[in-house]
Amino acid sequence: GLERFSIPSGTQVYDWRVPPEWVINDGYIITPDGDKICEFKKHNLHILNYSAPINMRLSLDELKQHIYTIPHMPTAIPYVTSYYERRWGFCMSDEQLCSLKDGEYHAFIDSKFKEDGELNYAQIIIPSTIKNDKEILISAYLCHPQMANNELSGPAIWCELVKFVKNLKHRRYNYRFVIAPETIGSICYINRNFETLKSKVVAGFVLSCIGDDRDYSVVLSPDENSLSDIATLHTIKHITNNPKIYPFLYRGSDER
């Protein structure tokens, strides 16, 4: 079954420490007309991730210094983070920003940084059906709020793969399924399981951004000749005529 693990904030992991846990309760902006906008409880992306708390009145020009938009996508609310700089901010569509008028605004973010917090990750290990200690590692990350492609797609396929592998009558390898916050969670997991991973894992896969309608793509391992590369390149040619094959130089997620 699913095993869940917690690492306390402040724990030494290689050359860094697990950061304080960010807790967000609410956030919004009150306009000069008294309207409440950028409500966290209506859309998580309205608050800068890892934002410091704020409760102040300020002018539009002052507020704009803390607002993030995507001008070339005028209706989109961007996903912006502040790891690990202590600053505050809001995210909104560029259309909404352009509609704001001069006057006094009230910016409110109810958040805190828990020095006694924790980082959580989980794993499921499905054993082989023959005598074999070698493993296939399959991971996905869980840390981007209210996002479909760059978040939910990975865990959704991860869950389906767990079901699929469990139902296999014959399994040559053991399967290690890991789900954790991107980057920091994976670093913690490697730190806690390094010797086991080094001695047993023969192939690894990271499920990232697999929920859009673009071409199937794969980022190869550094040597481009691992078991995971061979299996992926063999499979991908049977499901698409136009795969995107990237070298390891294009890494950007937990495959790093």
Tell where the protein language model's regions lie, with residue ranges.
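N-terminal hydrophobic/helix-forming segments and targeting peptides
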Residues: G1-R256
